[in-house]
UniProtKB/Swiss-Prot annotation:
Residues 650-672 are annotated as: Leucine-zipper 1. This is Nuclear pore complex protein Nup214. Gene3D superfamilies: YVTN repeat-like/Quinoprotein amine dehydrogenase. Part of the nuclear pore complex. Serves as a docking site in the receptor-mediated import of substrates across the nuclear pore complex including emb, RanGAP and phosphorylated Mad. Protects mbo/Nup88 from proteasomal degradation at the nuclear pore. Together with mbo/Nup88, sequesters emb in the cytoplasm and thereby attenuates nuclear export signal (NES)-mediated nuclear export. Together with mbo/Nup88, required for the nuclear import of the Rel family transcription factors dorsal (dl) and Dorsal-related immunity factor (Dif) and the activation of an immune response. Residues 1044-1711 are annotated as: Interaction with emb. Residues 1037-1051, 1058-1072 have a biased composition (Basic and acidic residues). Residues 472-1703 are annotated as: 45 X 2 AA repeats of F-G. One of its GO terms (biological process) is protein localization to nuclear pore. It is a peripheral membrane protein. It comes from Drosophila melanogaster (Fruit fly). One of its GO terms (molecular function) is nuclear localization sequence binding. Residues 1596-1614 have a biased composition (Low complexity).
Length: 1711
């Protein structure tokens, strides 16, 4: 069904104002059908009108036509004879060709003229074309191409179509459609590339210019009543047409449809019916469309309609909606009535844009508007101004160039008409059709009344109407057609007494008849005779006669003027005509005289005389009547005195009338005012009732009417308070809900990690104990029996019993009786009676004494927070606040540093110092103490002073909120069961204390992502001033000045006795940090002082630090424990995006490890390295067992450590299923993890060789950077100062200390810790000082081979590698990372290689890297390499292959709880994918098939995966194919990264060299796969790195989120986002063999989470992937060329693809 059209819209935006009406032809006869006799050449300014009855064509100059009204001159026209009467004329699109179709002797011909030839004397057609072979066929439509002016299509009346391409020299090319096609109409497309044709039945077809069919649109059967034809069509836009359907038969009205034919989908029809209101006759139905695309208008002209329809579209798009417009009555195009009051119809219609005149409406001048010309069926040419008064209307007019008339044949149009009249002998038969073409012939747009004066100057049209007799002799100007104005004829300028005659085209009813034209042709008014104008005029065909004045006219009429009224807005111009007496010839131009001569005066003179006589008679009669009427009136008046009485009475009546009016008016006003007040009252009452209805509770309190304004105001205020309170309450509720949800999450996680003891466990245990007791008693009893037997004593006793049994039958009877009466309770009682009360009591006592053993992991009890450490932390926070008030000079330095952006190579990171949190403590990952042999333990019992980091809510960084102090037993740090699961163990990590901070623990920072909460370092007796926050310029801060040659030692300026002034501000200030992404905030050297700027991603002072590590403020204590105030360059480590874990002192060495050696250096940007973290090592002889004060309970996600009661050194029990301390920060992605705790927990540092430093006050002024075996947290201080060469001197040990640290102490990593985003500082557990070789200060690195050195790479910064013997320069957070000796994997994967930091300058190539990067040390990442050969629950065991790192998703290597047995080193089983071969549980892994060879999903023989074919894994052969990573893209060759360097990973570059490619979404992929660690040997540009300038040893694979690692050393540095071994630093997850075996989960880097994989072949713990191919879930998904399906998942290998950015992650690599 067709849709109904929208309703009509009344508008005044578009108006048609009649400009001029002239007679173009006379005697047009009956209206002809199927003709179009009007065409315009807008480019030449010519209008062509074909005669409906004569073989002629009139060419009219449009400019003259427009000016005719104002100049009172006839438009210039030329009469061009044609071979026969024209049927259809049309102008080409460029206006240069005119096609005329005419039928000559029955043959239809098409004559095409050059338009310019009409201005020359000789007019000849350029082309003469015969349209059809048969006769009596004419053209129905001439369709010129709108773009190609030489292309013309002709629709013929027999249904054929001819297409002509006109060539030079009169030639043409033709294509045609046969008449069998029955073409009814056509239209070109707006661009002229196709033509659309209408066919019977509503079919519409699109053809190309060569008439090849392009598209067919069939009309559905239910659109229009069949049968019907398509009689007109207009192509509006690409997919939209206007069509007119006409049903066959009589009395059928046409209907206009808008046809929407979208490219896809069925066409739709919208029915507008007939907007022209056509009649059914007198002609055949024919419609002409005129589309004005600039104004989105469509004009529709009907052959049988008296009105032009107009439609508008206001929408954009392919198929906009159209709406019919209804214009004002005076602004429409309506065909005028003929003289006989018959309807006239359009014979032609032309839209003309050649106009140049401008109209003024309401004193506002409009822009040039186009015109519309209509030729009516009675020969009149109507010209309308087409006004668009919208302010946004675009101009469509363009003035034509002037055309010179060289023909000499253009004459005033009225002369052409006169010559026609001569040819007509019977001209008198229709006098009314011979308009006298006087200059003021027809003025139709005058809005004025007739002027009552005879004047030759413009007369305004506002004069009063002439009095009854004043019109004599005055020329009446004509009023507009619709108006009836006294003395005027609407369509022609009437002639008053002596005025020249005018044409009477549309009669109006005259008022009194004076000076008006007759209403009817016959005597219609008092003085008119047969249509002639009243008083002396008669319709003449001779222009000259028109100016004759009858002699009988009134004397004043001798010089009449005929004013021609201007357009509506112009003043009325009266153009004077100079008349002379009748007998003299009028002084007119030559042409009129010629006309006079052509007429015979003898013929006309008598007629004129007769008519004048008649008029005079009539006039005299009329005067006589008037006189008589006057006399009759005078008779009633007696005397003049009577008049006075009448006058007085009239005055009285007038006054009375006025008074009555006033009174009535006042009454009305009062009544209205009262009514208005009542209405207001009613409205107010309604409002009140509505309010009461809406809020019924108010009515209980008060009557709404009783509220006075003040009460209302108060009520409104109270309501606003209520609303505000409600809003706050809602917010509070939301907050509480959020916290509750988080709490529930924690509870769920804790409950998962906790063993729930069945409720009957106690009973069971007691029963078993009793059973054991009874069995023991039985054994004793049996012993006694056996001894009795031996001695023969038992036999006699038994015999006695036998005798007693064989008693008399009486006994048997009693027995039966007792059986009958026996009850169970008696038996029980009798049995109980066997035990005396004393015995029962003893049993009870024994049972009660034996306590039920509840075996469960314990966690520190947080309830009450009464730990001294916490109270101390609070006190420090208060002190810091007080201290914050005093600006330290250091702050000034930092501020200065902040301003200049550091040079690109240094890395755009603002100078490190500036950050308020400048002291981002790189919490050195204190390796979890391993049981170590205490050597020379002098003060075994010295507890390390707990560093008290504040708790960070949800911190991804390493903040260790509560350092738990643990007493140190020199050798083993056993976790006592009680210690184990205390309240907040979260399954993934430590208890959460707090609210979600991604960054260092801002103590109370809500959701801070990075601020490092300052971990207050353990009090150290003589803190090194290096952390001189107060002393901004400690010597160490200017390390550059020292010549490398002079001393490779940093002299720590360290007053021994002076307590280090580690500002304690940081803690307090970080507490109120709000969500900052990079704890850059550091003002001054305050350790943790984070500015409170809300949520900045790294800008200075940004609170939302993604990685600020909590600054560990070393607590200075007098005691001689080694104090390490490691000065970390202020902004260094902490900026891990998920910042590094706090330093956690390692328990392992007898050497005191100072916990959190973070030197906060607020050095100016220029300092190459902030002073080395000089640990004032004076009293190095530390108790051999320093308990790591920050022994963080490892938590999968957090390295946050909590205050934990002393942990005995036994490190073997993993407290948490996923390990990692997270004891305090709920869900922190970065803190260090207590290795001992946790499935994924960091492994404790491999026993570091105990080195005892014997000198108590050994001041090592020149702190040689020998990595002492002290497992002091090597706080490698990275200075982000522009200097490219920061040498970080890490733990300075008294020189005397032996540096035999072999400890591969894994830095505690948390399973998910992301190493500091920006800081790549990680102190390897063994203090492996990284000395920058290139720095002038190259500190010697002693031989300590701390294998376990974890360098934590920072997400954005180079990995901070603590290279033991490597003299790799330490990179500042933003500088390129030094090569970390160990490749550390990051959850998002760091590239194990020296790389420039994302943001920073290149580090110089490490000079001494001892080993080429061996792929041996696959970095461990969350999902990457597992620890060495300890079975780990999730990691596959490694049997042998050194390099393979198994992955949670990836290849297995040694039997694991879940999984596949270790196989060849390459194969790693995947949790989800093919596992390796046989596993403890059968060869299939819980989640995946145990596949012997495939990395992540190679389908091993028979292994099946729970999820079907490795749902997430691609099966890959054991070949070193790519190790995929969830987020990683294959490594392989470096790929360009969107942000910069090469990797195509979105943020980073893939690592290139490693055979196994593991890409990371955030960083270059490398073989290691977890979330992104990747190893690579060749530099790949880092996403954030290369882009921002990386430079250093030329190789830097920067990773977006993963810190790059240098694979060269075998040591691994963990550091996901935060340098600390966050995720996997060896100690954290990997190092100490928590689960037995060396490493927690496996290799030493066991769940080395992010930290490096252990050099040994170990399945990559949670992190790094190993070389072997391991496809990764998402990577393989994305890598599939064929798209995702569960079928392909397992089948496709890691097609080696360099997948585009986002590292082949899923979603088809974002192809």
């Amino acid at each position: 069904m067709a849709q109904n059209a929208p309703d009509c819209e009344d508008t005044q935006d578009f108006q048609f104002k009649l400009h001029h009406k002239i007679v173009a032809f006379k005697k047009c006869g009956e209206p002809r059908s199927n003709v179009n006799l009007l065409a315009v050449s807008s480019s030449r300014g010519l209008l062509f009108a074909g005669s409906p009855t004569q073989p002629e064509l009139k060419v009219i100059i449009v400019k003259d036509l427009v000016n005719a009204k104002s100049t009172a001159q006839q438009p210039q026209a030329r009469l061009v004879p044609l071979p026969s009467i024209p049927n259809y004329i049309a102008c080409s699109s460029d206006g240069n060709l005119l096609a005329v179709n005419h039928t000559q002797n029955g043959t239809s011909l098409l004559s095409i003229y050059a338009v310019l030839s009409f201005m020359t004397p000789d007019v000849r057609p350029v082309y003469n074309i015969r349209l059809a072979a048969e006769d009596h066929v004419h053209g129905v439509q001439l369709l010129w191409n709108p773009v190609l002016p030489n292309s013309l299509a002709v629709v013929l009346s027999n249904g054929a179509l001819a297409m002509y391409a006109l060539k030079e020299g009169g030639n043409f090319e033709m294509h045609s459609l046969d008449k069998n096609q029955q073409v009814k109409c056509g239209c070109w497309s707006p661009k002229g590339k196709q033509i659309v044709l209408g066919f019977p039945g509503g079919t519409v077809k699109q053809f190309k210019p060569d008439l090849t069919l392009a598209k067919t649109l069939l009309c559905p059967p239910n659109i229009h009543d069949a049968p019907f034809d398509t009689i007109a069509i207009q192509w509006l836009s690409t997919f939209q047409f206007a069509v007119i359907f006409l049903q066959h038969g009589e009395d059928c009205s046409p209907s206009l449809y808008i046809l929407n034919a979208p490219k896809a989908g069925a066409p739709s029809y919208i029915n507008y019916y007939d907007i022209c209101y056509s009649m059914n006759g007198p002609r055949n139905h024919q419609f002409v469309f005129s589309h004005v695309p600039q104004w989105n208008l469509l004009l529709v002209v009907s052959a049988n309609g008296v009105e032009v329809g107009i439609m508008r579209s206001t929408e954009a798009g392919d198929t906009p909606a159209w709406q019919q417009l209804t214009l004002l009555d005076e602004a429409r195009i309506e065909m005028p009535l003929s003289e006989d009051k018959d309807e006239t119809f359009p014979l032609g219609f032309a839209f003309d844009t050649s106009t140049t005149h401008q109209l003024t409406i309401n004193e506002k001048k409009l822009q040039t508007m186009p015109m519309v010309h209509v030729l009516s069926s009675d020969g009149e040419l109507l010209s309308f101004n087409f006004l668009n008064v919208l302010p946004t209307a675009v101009s469509v007019c363009s003035p034509p160039p002037p055309v010179a008339d060289t023909s000499g044949q253009f004459k005033p149009l009225n002369m052409l008409l006169a010559s026609e009249e001569e040819e007509q002998p019977a001209w008198a038969a229709s006098p009314s059709k011979a308009p006298a073409a006087t200059p003021a012939a027809s003025s139709d747009i005058s809005f004025a009344f007739t002027p009552n004066t005879v004047t030759s100057t413009p007369a305004p049209s506002k004069d009063k109407q002439p009095s009854l007799f004043s019109g004599f002799g005055a020329a009446a100007a004509k009023a507009p057609a619709p108006q009836l104005s006294f003395g005027t004829a609407p369509t022609s300028s009437p002639v008053s007494f002596g005025a020249p005659t005018t044409n009477a085209a549309k009669p109006t009813t005259p008022f009194g008849g004076f000076g008006t034209q007759a209403t009817t042709t016959a005597m219609g008014s008092m003085f008119s005779a047969s249509g002639a104008n009243a008083f002396g005029g008669m319709a003449l065909n001779k222009p000259a006669i028109a100016s004759v004045t009858p002699r009988t006219a009134a004397p004043g009429s001798t010089v009449p003027a005929t004013p021609a009224s201007a357009p509506a807005n112009k003043p009325l111009y009266t153009v004077p005509l100079t008349f002379t007496p009748v007998d003299t010839k009028p002084a007119t131009s030559a042409p009129p005289q010629i006309a006079d001569e052509s007429l015979k005066p003898d013929d006309t003179e008598p007629i004129i005389k007769d008519m004048i006589a008649l008029q005079i008679e009539a006039f005299s009669k009329d005067i006589q009547k008037q006189k008589e009427q006057t006399k009759e009136l005078l008779k009633g008046i007696a005397a003049p005195s009577a008049l006075r009485a009448y006058a007085k009475r009239l005055d009285d009546l007038q006054e009375l009338n006025e008074q009555a009016k006033d009174v009535e008016f006042e009454l009305d006003v009062q009544g209205l005012r009262q009514g208005l007040n009542e209405a207001y009252a009613i409205v107010a009452e309604c409002r009140g009732k509505l309010e009461i209805y809406r809020k019924p509770e108010i009515t209980r309190l008060m009557n709404s009417s009783s509220c006075d304004p003040s009460g209302r105001r108060m009520l409104a205020r109270l309501q606003s308070y209520v609303a505000a309170n409600e809003a706050q309450l809602r917010l509070a509720q939301q907050h509480v809900d959020l916290q509750w949800e988080q709490f529930q999450d924690v509870v769920r996680r804790n409950s998962k990690s906790r063993m729930h003891m069945p409720c009957l466990e106690g009973i069971y245990q007691r029963l078993t104990r009793l059973q054991n007791l009874t069995s023991n008693q039985r054994i004793v009893q049996n012993n006694i029996k056996s001894k009795l037997k031996e001695r023969g004593l038992l036999q006699a006793a038994l015999l006695d019993q036998e005798k007693s049994r064989t008693r008399t039958n009486e006994a048997v009877d009693t027995l039966t009786d007792s059986i009958l009466t026996m009850s169970l309770s008696q038996v029980v009682d009798s049995n109980a009676a066997k035990l005396t009360r004393e015995r029962l009591q003893k049993i009870r006592n024994i049972v009660q004494l034996q306590k039920i053993n509840v075996i469960c992991p314990q966690r520190p009890d947080r309830v009450g927070l009464k730990s001294e450490v916490i109270l101390e932390t609070k006190r420090r926070a208060e002190q810091i606040k007080r201290a914050a008030a005093k600006p330290a000079t250091a702050n000034k330095y930092t501020q200065a540093a902040v301003a200049p952006p550091s040079p690109p190579d240094v890395a755009p990171t603002p100078a490190v110092a500036p950050m308020p949190q400048a002291t981002v403590t790189v919490a050195p990952p204190l390796p979890k103490p391993m049981p170590s042999i205490p050597s020379v333990v002098e003060k075994p019992g010295v507890p390390t002073h707990p560093t008290t980091p504040v708790a960070t809510p949800f911190s991804f960084s390493q903040s260790i909120p509560f350092v738990k102090t643990s007493t140190v037993t020199p050798t083993t740090n056993t976790v006592t069961p009680g210690e184990a699961a205390k309240p907040g163990l979260s399954i993934f990590g430590g208890s959460t204390i707090s609210s979600f901070s991604f960054g260092g623990g801002a103590a109370k920072s809500a959701l801070s992502f990075g601020t490092g909460s300052p971990a207050v370092a353990a009090p150290t007796p003589k803190p090194n001033p290096l952390s001189a926050v107060e002393k901004p310029t400690p010597e160490p801060t200017k390390p550059k000045e020292q010549k490398a040659a002079e001393s490779k030692e940093f002299k720590a300026v360290q007053p021994e006795t002076e307590e280090s002034k580690v500002p304690q501000k940081p803690k307090a200030e970080t507490e109120n940090k709000s969500f900052g992404f990079g704890g850059f905030t550091g003002t001054g050297g305050t350790v943790g002082n984070t500015s409170s700027s809300p949520f900045s991603f790294g800008g200075l002072g940004s609170s939302l630090g993604f990685g600020g590590t909590a600054a560990a403020v070393p607590k200075s204590e007098p005691s001689s424990t080694a104090t390490t105030s490691v000065a970390t360059s202020a902004s260094t480590a902490p900026f891990g995006i998920f910042s590094a874990a706090l330093a956690k002192p390692s328990n392992s060495e007898p050497i005191t490890t100072v916990t959190s050696n973070t030197t906060t250096i607020t050095s100016k940007p220029t300092n190459v390295i902030a002073s080395s973290s000089v640990t004032d090592a004076p009293s190095v002889t530390t108790t051999n067992a320093v308990t790591s004060s920050t022994d963080p309970i490892g938590g999968l996600f957090s390295s946050v450590t909590i205050c934990k009661p002393n942990t005995p050194a036994d490190t073997t029990k993993p407290a948490n299923i996923f390990g990692g301390g997270l004891s305090a920060g709920s869900f922190s992605f970065g803190g260090t993890i207590d290795a001992s705790k946790g499935l994924f927990g960091s492994t404790k540092p491999v026993a570091t060789a105990p080195t005892s430093v014997t000198e108590a006050n050994n001041k090592t002024d020149p702190i040689s950077t020998t990595p002492s075996a002290i497992s002091t947290t090597t706080a490698t201080t990275t200075v982000s100062s522009p200097a490219v060469v920061p040498a970080a001197v890490t733990a300075a040990v008294p020189a005397t200390s032996s540096t035999t640290v072999t400890s591969s102490t894994a830095v505690p990593g948390s399973a998910f810790s992301f190493s500091n985003a920006f800081s790549t500082l990680s102190a390897g557990g063994a203090a492996a000082p990284t000395t920058s070789a290139s720095a002038p200060l190259a500190a010697k690195s002693p031989t300590a081979t701390s294998t376990g050195n974890n360098s934590s790479n920072s997400v954005f910064g180079g990995g901070f590698a603590v290279a033991t013997s490597t003299a790799a320069p330490v990179a500042s957070p933003f500088q390129s990372a030094a090569k970390s000796p160990v490749s550390s994997a990051n959850i998002f994967g760091s590239i194990p290689k020296a790389e420039t930091s994302v943001f920073g300058g290149a580090t110089t190539a490490p000079s001494n890297t001892t080993a080429a990067a061996t792929p041996d040390a696959p970095p461990a990442g969350l999902f990457a390499s597992a620890a060495i050969s300890n079975p780990s629950p999730f990691g596959s065991p490694t049997t042998r292959a050194p390099a393979s790192g198994g992955n949670i998703f990836g290849q297995a290597v040694k039997p694991s709880v879940f999984g596949q047995p270790a196989q060849a080193g390459d194969s790693g089983g995947s949790i989800f994918g093919g596992g390796s071969a046989s596993t403890p549980f059968g060869s299939s892994s819980i989640f995946g098939g145990g596949n012997t060879q495939g990395a992540v999903g190679a389908p091993a023989a028979g292994s099946t995966s729970i999820f079907g074919q490795k749902v997430f894994g691609q099966s890959s052969a054991a070949a070193p194919a790519a190790g995929g990573n969830i987020f990683s893209n294959p490594v392989g060759s470096p790929q360009a990264s969107p942000f910069g360097g090469g990797g195509n990973s979105i943020f980073g570059s893939p690592a290139t060299a490693p055979p196994a490619s593991g890409g990371s979404i955030f960083g270059g992929g490398s073989s290691s796969g977890g979330f992104g660690s990747f190893t690579q040997t060749t530099p790949a540009q880092g996403g954030f790195g290369g882009g921002f300038g990386q430079g250093g040893g030329g190789s830097v694979a920067q990773t977006g989120f993963g810190s790059p690692q240098a694979p060269q050393q075998q040591t691994t540095t963990p550091g996901g986002f935060g340098a600390k071994p966050v995720f996997g630093g060896s100690p954290a997850f990997g190092a100490s063999p928590t689960f037995g075996g060396g490493a927690t989960f496996g290799s030493p880097k066991g769940f080395g989470g992010f930290g490096g994989a252990s050099p040994v072949a170990s399945p990559p713990p949670f992190g790094a992937a190993a070389k072997p191919a391991q496809g990764n879930i998402f990577e393989t998904l994305g890598g599939q060329e064929s798209g995702l399906s569960f079928g392909n998942l397992a089948q496709t290998g890691n097609s080696n693809a360099q997948k585009p950015a986002f590292g082949g992650s899923s979603f088809m690599n974002y192809r």
